[in-house]
C-alpha cells in the first residue's frame, strides 16, 4: 500500500493510492454504502461508473448483520460482491450523533444500543477488532468526536485523547493487508490542529484523516481549518477530509491540498428529487417547472439516467415510485465521480485557475431549461465570500 503523487498545481496534488483491491486516483470522492449497500444502487452500477472505492459504516455493520457474520461470509468485499476498495469508519461519529445516551472516558465510548437499549462500551481496541473482521482496505482509528462548535478545554482534551487512542489502535492493528488512518482533531482552533497534525504525522504510515468538520460550522472557518491542516501534514501521505460532499466544497478542498472525501449527500438529496448539475448547482425535479421539460437532467452527463430519461419523467415519479430515487441517485453519484475526474485533469494539466473560473461561473449561474422563459432567473447568483477568500488564498483570481 503506497501513495504516489503524479502531479502538483499550487497546493493541489493528483495521485494514485495503491490498495489491495484497486488503484484509487486522487482527489477522489467516496460514495457511502452505510450497511454494505448504496441507497438504490447495486455494486455493478458503481463499477460501470468506474468507482474505485466506497465507504461503509462500522457502527451500522457492527449491529446489523454484525461483524462476526460478515467475517463468516468471507469479509465485506465478498458479502456485498464488491471487488474494489473499501474504507470503513471507526463508528465513533455515529455513536455521538445517533445515541441519546453517550459518554466518553479514557477507556472508550459508552453508548446505548439502538436495538436492545442496553449500555455498551467501544474501546479503541474493539473498534479495530470489528474493522479487521469487516476486512476493509482502509480502517480509521477510534477518535474522541466532539461537535465542531464546541469550545473550551474539552477541545484540547479530545485532541490529546484521540492521539492516545491512536496508539492503542496501532497495538490492536494486526493485519498487514489493511491500512489504518489517524484522525486529526482540534475543533476550529488552528493551533490545536497543527499540534495534532504534528503528532499524527509521527504515527501515520499510509494516510491521515481530517475529522471534526462539516458539522454546522461557518464555511469561512471550514476552509481555513482544511487549509491549515493540509499545510501541516506530510506531503507524501493522502489527506482525507471526512464528511465532505457538496460540489463546491469538494473543488475548494481539492485545490487546498486534500485528496479524499466522503458523504451521503448525493443519495440522500436524491430521495427528495434533487439532482446535482454543473450549471445551477441543484435541480429540484419535484418542482412544477419540470412537468413538461423533456431534456435529460444534464445533456453532457453520460450516466444511464441522462442517456435514457427526461426531467419530465423523473418529475412524474419522484416521491411516488422508488425508481425515481434510483434514477436521481445514479445521476448524482456519476456527477460527483465525473467532477473529481475533471479536478484531477485540471491538476494534471496545471489549469486549476481556468477550471475554477469555469466551474464557479457555471455553478452559480442559472439552470439551463428547454424553454428559457421558464427559468427562475437569468442572473448569476453571487459567489460566496468564503469561496472568493479560499480562491485568493490559493493565489488565483476570479474575474466575475
UniProtKB/Swiss-Prot annotation:
Gene Ontology MF term list: metal ion binding; tRNA-guanosine(34) queuine transglycosylase activity
Binding site for substrate: 89-93, 143, 185, 212
GO biological process entries: tRNA-guanine transglycosylation
UniProt keyword Repressor, yes or no: no
Keywords annotated in UniProt: Cytoplasm, Glycosyltransferase, Metal-binding, Transferase, tRNA processing, Zinc
Compartment(s) of residence: Cytoplasm
Binding-site list for Zn(2+): 301, 303, 306, 331
Active-site feature positions: 89 (proton acceptor), 262 (nucleophile)
Function: Catalytic subunit of the queuine tRNA-ribosyltransferase (TGT) that catalyzes the base-exchange of a guanine (G) residue with queuine (Q) at position 34 (anticodon wobble position) in tRNAs with GU(N) anticodons (tRNA-Asp, -Asn, -His and -Tyr), resulting in the hypermodified nucleoside queuosine (7-(((4,5-cis-dihydroxy-2-cyclopenten-1-yl)amino)methyl)-7-deazaguanosine). Catalysis occurs through a double-displacement mechanism. The nucleophile active site attacks the C1' of nucleotide 34 to detach the guanine base from the RNA, forming a covalent enzyme-RNA intermediate.
HAMAP family: Q_tRNA_Tgt
Quaternary structure note: Heterodimer of a catalytic subunit and an accessory subunit.
NCBIfam families: Q_tRNA_tgt, tgt_general
Protein name: Queuine tRNA-ribosyltransferase catalytic subunit
The species this protein was found in: Caenorhabditis elegans
Lineage: Eukaryota, Metazoa, Ecdysozoa, Nematoda, Chromadorea
Amino acid at each position: 500500500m503506497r501513495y504516489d503523487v503524479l502531479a502538483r498545481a499550487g497546493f493541489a496534488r493528483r495521485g494514485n493510492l495503491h490498495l489491495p483491491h484497486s488503484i484509487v486516483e486522487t482527489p477522489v470522492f467516496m460514495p457511502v454504502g452505510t450497511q454494505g449497500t448504496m441507497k438504490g444502487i447495486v455494486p455493478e452500477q458503481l463499477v460501470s461508473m468506474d468507482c474505485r472505492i466506497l465507504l461503509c459504516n462500522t457502527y451500522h455493520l457492527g449491529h446489523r448483520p454484525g461483524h462476526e457474520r460478515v467475517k463468516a461470509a468471507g469479509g465485506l468485499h465478498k458479502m456485498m460482491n464488491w471487488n474494489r476498495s473499501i474504507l470503513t469508519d471507526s463508528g465513533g461519529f455515529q455513536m455521538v450523533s445517533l445515541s441519546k445516551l453517550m459518554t466518553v472516558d479514557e477507556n472508550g465510548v459508552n453508548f446505548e444500543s439502538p436495538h436492545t437499549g442496553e449500555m455498551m462500551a467501544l474501546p479503541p481496541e474493539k473498534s479495530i477488532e470489528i474493522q479487521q473482521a469487516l476486512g476493509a482496505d482502509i480502517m480509521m482509528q477510534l477518535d474522541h468526536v466532539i461537535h465542531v462548535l464546541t469550545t473550551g478545554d474539552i477541545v484540547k482534551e479530545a485532541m490529546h485523547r484521540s492521539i492516545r487512542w491512536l496508539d492503542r489502535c496501532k497495538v490492536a492493528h494486526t493485519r498487514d493487508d489493511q491500512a489504518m488512518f489517524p484522525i486529526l482533531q482540534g475543533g476550529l482552533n488552528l493551533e490545536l490542529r497543527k499540534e495534532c497534525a504534528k503528532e499524527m504525522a509521527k504515527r501515520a504510515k499510509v494516510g491521515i484523516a481530517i475529522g471534526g468538520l462539516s458539522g454546522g460550522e461557518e464555511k469561512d472557518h471550514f476552509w481555513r481549518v482544511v487549509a491549515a491542516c493540509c499545510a501541516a501534514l506530510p506531503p507524501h501521505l493522502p489527506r482525507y477530509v471526512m464528511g465532505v460532499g457538496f460540489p463546491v466544497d469538494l473543488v475548494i478542498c481539492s485545490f487546498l491540498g486534500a485528496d479524499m472525501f466522503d458523504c451521503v449527500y448525493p443519495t440522500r438529496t436524491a430521495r427528495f428529487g434533487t439532482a446535482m448539475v454543473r450549471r445551477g448547482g441543484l435541480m429540484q425535479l419535484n418542482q412544477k417547472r419540470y412537468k413538461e421539460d423533456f431534456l435529460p437532467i444534464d445533456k453532457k452527463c453520460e450516466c444511464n439516467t441522462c442517456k435514457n430519461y427526461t426531467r419530465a419523467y423523473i418529475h412524474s415519479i419522484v416521491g411516488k415510485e422508488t425508481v425515481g430515487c434510483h434514477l436521481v441517485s445514479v445521476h448524482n453519484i456519476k456527477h460527483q465521480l465525473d467532477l473529481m475526474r475533471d479536478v484531477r485533469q485540471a491538476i494534471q494539466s496545471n489549469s486549476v485557475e481556468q477550471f475554477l473560473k469555469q466551474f464557479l461561473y457555471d455553478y452559480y449561474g442559472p439552470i439551463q431549461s428547454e424553454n428559457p422563459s421558464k427559468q427562475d432567473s437569468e442572473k448569476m447568483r453571487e459567489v460566496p465570500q468564503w469561496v472568493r477568500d479560499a480562491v485568493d488564498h490559493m493565489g488565483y483570481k476570479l474575474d466575475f
